């Protein structure tokens, strides 16, 4: 069974980036407990790229069904509405990638 990499991208106007970044930082407290308890979670990252005025949530799951739990995770849905109300746009659909290969650091470096 191959793991799934889920990627969600938010874009905003450059003058709203700082506010959106702070909202994303604050979102961790709301989202972390529920996400950590989800079946199949392997890793979760929130990130920001000021150069493109974008924020991302990238996660790795054991399978597609596990990744799709995020589609109905109410705290995430609610926060998405808050971001949208502040002018954010989301790339849709959210992408769920079946992994083709992976790399890990070599233990012999």
Predicted feature locations:
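A common structural junction motif
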Residues: 77-81
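Short S/T/G/P-rich N-terminal loop/turn motif that feeds into the first structured element of a domain
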Residues: 1-56, 62-75, 85-109
